């Protein structure tokens, strides 16, 4: 197994977090370490900083309307910091951005996808993380590749 990447995690709760901060730090660190070989050089690092926020449908609908002109609830939004970010200073973590997850939407989707709320949150967080790292899904092929990578991350998390 790859060593863990150091991570500074800024958690914000506007809703309950079924996993807890320690588990999120462990998961995100593990995922970032697993993804190192696939990252472009500017994103390869030993340490990262990112935000993870859990909110309700009203809060995510407001963000979705403001940033994507779709004023309705969604499951996860990602706000990448690296698109226009300056070169990171040596010795400091690379700021990736923020992931925002709607707990009520995740609660509705979990049974539809045939798994627990915890598994749905892992899936959504991994999706958000991949977006922060530059992955996107403008077409079916790239969506399939991204979902496959998410599945691998989530399955790896289940083994721990």
UniProtKB/Swiss-Prot annotation:
Source superkingdom: Bacteria
BP GO annotations: rRNA processing
GO cellular component terms given for this protein: cytoplasm
Enzyme Commission designation: 3.1.-.-
Keyword Metal-binding: yes
Top-level EC class as recorded in UniProt: hydrolase
NCBIfam families named in the record: rRNA maturation RNase YbeY (TIGR00043)
Cross-referenced HAMAP family: Endoribonucl_YbeY
Function of the protein: Single strand-specific metallo-endoribonuclease involved in late-stage 70S ribosome quality control and in maturation of the 3' terminus of the 16S rRNA.
Name of the protein described by the UniProt record: Endoribonuclease YbeY
Organism: Synechococcus sp. (strain RCC307)
Lineage of source species: Bacteria, Bacillati, Cyanobacteriota, Cyanophyceae, Synechococcales
Gene from which the chain derives: ybeY
